[in-house]
Amino acid sequence: MKKVIINTWHSFVNIPNVVGPDVEKEITRMENGACSSFSGDDDDSASMFEESETENPHARDSFRSNTHGSGQPSQREQYLPGAIALFNVNNSSNKEQEPKEKKKKKKEKKSKPDDKNENKKDPEKKKKKEKDKDKKKKEEKGKDKKEEEKKEVVVIDPSGNTYYNWLFCITLPVMYNWTMIIARACFDELQSDYLEYWLAFDYLSDVVYLLDMFVRTRTGYLEQGLLVKEERKLIDKYKSTFQFKLDVLSVIPTDLLYIKFGWNYPEIRLNRLLRISRMFEFFQRTETRTNYPNIFRISNLVMYIIIIIHWNACVYFSISKAIGFGNDTWVYPDVNDPDFGRLARKYVYSLYWSTLTLTTIGETPPPVRDSEYFFVVADFLIGVLIFATIVGNIGSMISNMNAARAEFQARIDAIKQYMHFRNVSKDMEKRVIKWFDYLWTNKKTVDEREVLKYLPDKLRAEIAINVHLDTLKKVRIFADCEAGLLVELVLKLQPQVYSPGDYICKKGDIGREMYIIKEGKLAVVADDGITQFVVLSDGSYFGEISILNIKGSKAGNRRTANIKSIGYSDLFCLSKDDLMEALTEYPDAKGMLEEKGKQILMKDGLLDINIANAGSDPKDLEEKVTRMESSVDLLQTRFARILAEYESMQQKLKQRLTKVEKFLKPLIDTEFSAIEGSGTESGPTDSTQD
């Protein structure tokens, strides 16, 4: 007989009633598969449960023996150790906090009667605390703003005028050092006689060098299209460049060596020459800014040549001093001679010798010593390079300056040959040549589209707006149009020049363009071409109604007057096709322009109202149908061409496949035969083995 132990609630004598339900709930949750730890609210129950376990272990064992079936542990027994472990962990932390919690409870009990009085004062205290917090936040924000204001740094835009002006300031001391340091080192009198001035200029240039390094740390640069203004980034960017190392070397205080060697050694300041890149940068920016770049390039080249000749003259004088003045015919003459003892004569003679040598003219005394020969050979090589540079650069500059004239002259020559070949009258030839002369003298030979085609669309539109928009707004029908349409039309305006006596349009001509007078005078003349009715001047326009092709116009699409140029006239032309192309994107503007055109025709009595209100014109429908037919024909031809290409490609592919088959067939046959042969050979061997 198996004994079945039935545990009742009375078996757990030492377990308080408060703990039982909570523990049972947690155990049932764990049986159902819920993996959750006990919350902080269950810490007390866990500790009480642990105490009951320690006091009555028999009850714990009897509780565990409560199974669903005999001989097998229940799910409660499986999960209970984990639950008890969790209870122990929580209990250990709770035991440490028990004395503190007891003290807090005592304080709370004591402070309960006081809290009733303080609850009344709580709103006032809360308000005061909130006000104090707001004040602190405002003070912190004010401090942050002040700190941000302090951190804000004035950044120089490298493309602005301030940076360009500073480049000019730093170029002056650089050029001073490059010209005077070598001269003072070679000509002792120049250094000793004007020592005070040189020292003042030297240290002033050093101050400018230091300021230039500071300016470099405040010069912005573009990062993702935006100018960087953070001080730390600017400094790090400058330090990471190779120029920073050169700048540091150029401001090393080598003047301290004056204490050891004396004031007659200005060559100790040669490290100041390392700042030459700033001079090159200034010249480069000036070349892009000036309106006369070719002249600036020539003058810049001449300056470089003069500096090279100056340095060569100083080196020649120093070599003569090292060998001895007057020791041979090649060196500088004896300085004891009054004619050659002056400082001005020393420099001029050396400069003259250097110029003759570097320009390969010669006519100088021949060298005597080996060192003199080496120096003259080096000078001749440098002179050849300088001469080639001069000829090449000046030749290219002159060709660039005359490129426009040469191209224009080529056009005139081609037209002259054509008129001579076609036997054009002499009067017509004179008119054509005068027209070309007018274009050249008034600098109207530039093709605007050719010049502006390299610019982005937005920049090109802005230039066209600045040049033509005011002129286009003078036209009545375009006065109230939206800005987008005006920009489209401005880009389509074409400049035209007419010579005296040229007809812009004649009565009865089909109107395909409208004209706006930019400069010059036009006359509305009779059929005889002499009688003038009206003179049109700058800002006038005509032909705007004809390009709208308004239905019901009695004049149709033809010109109603003869307009002739009195002198040379500059006009802007807007074609009908360009206008209609622009109006396709602006249908509302098209309707508004047609209404304005109808009002103008009604005022002049040139509008047939019945036809205008008759609805759509069948001619327009016919035009649309013809356009559709032409587009369909175009598509058919394209489809036929594509189909023919497809068929030809198929034929070529088939031919290639047949060639490949012919090539591979013998190879495949040989391989199959080899396989069959190997199979027959292996058969008898297998049988013998068996």
Swiss-Prot record:
Residues 482-603 are annotated as: Cyclic nucleotide-binding domain (CNBD). Residues 403-479 are annotated as: C-linker. Residues 1-163, 216-241, 284-291, 400-690 are cytoplasmic. Keywords: Calcium, Calcium channel, Calcium transport, cAMP, cAMP-binding, Cell membrane, cGMP, cGMP-binding, Coiled coil, Glycoprotein, Ion channel, Ion transport, Ligand-gated ion channel, Membrane, Nucleotide-binding, Sensory transduction, Sodium, Sodium channel, Sodium transport, Transmembrane, Transmembrane helix, Transport, Vision. It is found in: Cell membrane. 3',5'-cyclic AMP binds at residues 559-560. PROSITE patterns: CNMP_BINDING_1, CNMP_BINDING_2, CNMP_BINDING_3. It is a multi-pass membrane protein. Residues 293-402 are annotated as: Ion conduction pathway. The keyword Iron-sulfur does not apply. InterPro entries: CLZ_dom, CNG_cation_channel, cNMP-bd_CS, cNMP-bd_dom, cNMP-bd_dom_sf, Ion_trans_dom, RmlC-like_jellyroll. The record marks 387, 391 as: Central gate. SUPFAM superfamilies: cAMP-binding domain-like, Voltage-gated potassium channels. Residues 40-54 have a biased composition (Acidic residues). GO terms for cellular component: intracellular cyclic nucleotide activated cation channel complex; photoreceptor outer segment; plasma membrane; rod photoreceptor outer segment; transmembrane transporter complex. Pore-forming subunit of the rod cyclic nucleotide-gated channel. Mediates rod photoresponses at dim light converting transient changes in intracellular cGMP levels into electrical signals. In the dark, cGMP levels are high and keep the channel open enabling a steady inward current carried by Na(+) and Ca(2+) ions that leads to membrane depolarization and neurotransmitter release from synaptic terminals. Belongs to the cyclic nucleotide-gated cation channel (TC 1.A.1.5) family. CNGA1 subfamily. PANTHER family: CYCLIC NUCLEOTIDE-GATED CATION CHANNEL SUBUNIT A, CYCLIC NUCLEOTIDE-GATED CHANNEL ROD PHOTORECEPTOR SUBUNIT ALPHA. This is Cyclic nucleotide-gated channel alpha-1. It comes from Bos taurus. The lineage of its organism: Eukaryota, Metazoa, Chordata, Craniata, Vertebrata.
